[in-house]
């Protein structure tokens, strides 16, 4: 449940509509679990507690591994209280945490993620063009951000390997002259 106790009705409808559009978008590649409004359909275990993100993407193979957690925010729900109450626990999970925010709130969301050290894998924006919702990727974390840093770098060998000799380039056949047509050349 969101720390915003009562979200305005119009924003709640927009929030739930974005969740359903994301479900349709990811339906072919993942098993999608959604939690619109106050519903608690798809849970994610985090230590001893259970979390209910807006969208849970599960792999379609036998293991049904969690691939990503998606949290959708509206203009009023992008705030510090929301970031600490929901984004921080989602960022601590093993699966990738994706954040969807309105286009005008992108800078605020990025600043909150950096200030609170929330490891978000991707931030996307959404906006309406006519009667169609557009989702645009705005930020993608470096690929090694979730990889453990305990691996030592591989030692370089003492002697460098000799490079193979480059083969000479093959000659291309000469270009054929253009065909003559019955037309006169174009004037410039």
Protein language model regions, located:
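Residue-level detector of solvent-exposed, low-hydrophobicity positions
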Residues: 33, 37, 41, 94, ...
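Polybasic, lysine-enriched low-complexity intrinsically disordered terminal tails
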Residues: 147-188
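Catalytic cores of nucleic-acid endonucleases
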Residues: 65-67, 74-123
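Residue-level signal for functionally critical sites in structured catalytic/ligand-binding pockets
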Residues: 15, 33-35, 71-73, 86, ...
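Domain-level recognition of nuclease-like catalytic cores that cleave nucleotide substrates
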Residues: 104-153
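A structural preference for short, hydrophobic beta-strand core positions in alpha/beta folds
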Residues: 32-34, 99, 125
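Short secondary-structure transition/capping segments
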Residues: 12-13, 78-87, 117, 142-158
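Active-site metal-binding core of divalent-cation-utilizing nuclease and nuclease-like domains
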Residues: 1-69, 76, 138
């Amino acid at each position: 449940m969101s720390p915003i106790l009562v979200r305005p009705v119009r924003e709640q409808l927009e929030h739930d509509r974005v969740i359903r559009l994301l479900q349709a978008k990811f339906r072919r590649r993942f098993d999608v679990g959604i939690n619109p409004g106050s519903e608690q359909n798809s849970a994610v275990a985090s230590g001893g507690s259970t979390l209910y993100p807006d969208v849970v993407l599960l792999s379609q193979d036998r293991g049904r591994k969690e691939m990503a957690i998606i949290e959708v925010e509206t203009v009023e729900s992008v705030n510090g209280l929301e970031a600490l109450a929901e984004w921080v626990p989602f960022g601590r999970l093993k699966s990738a945490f994706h954040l969807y925010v309105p286009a005008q709130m992108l800078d605020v969301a990025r600043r909150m993620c950096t200030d609170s050290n929330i490891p978000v894998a991707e931030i996307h924006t959404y906006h309406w063009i006519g009667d169609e919702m557009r989702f645009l990727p705005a930020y993608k974390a470096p690929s090694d951000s979730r990889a453990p840093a305990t691996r030592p770098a591989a030692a370089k060998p003492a002697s460098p390997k000799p490079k193979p000799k480059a083969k000479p380039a093959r000659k291309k056949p000469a270009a054929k002259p253009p065909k003559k047509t019955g037309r006169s050349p174009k004037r410039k």
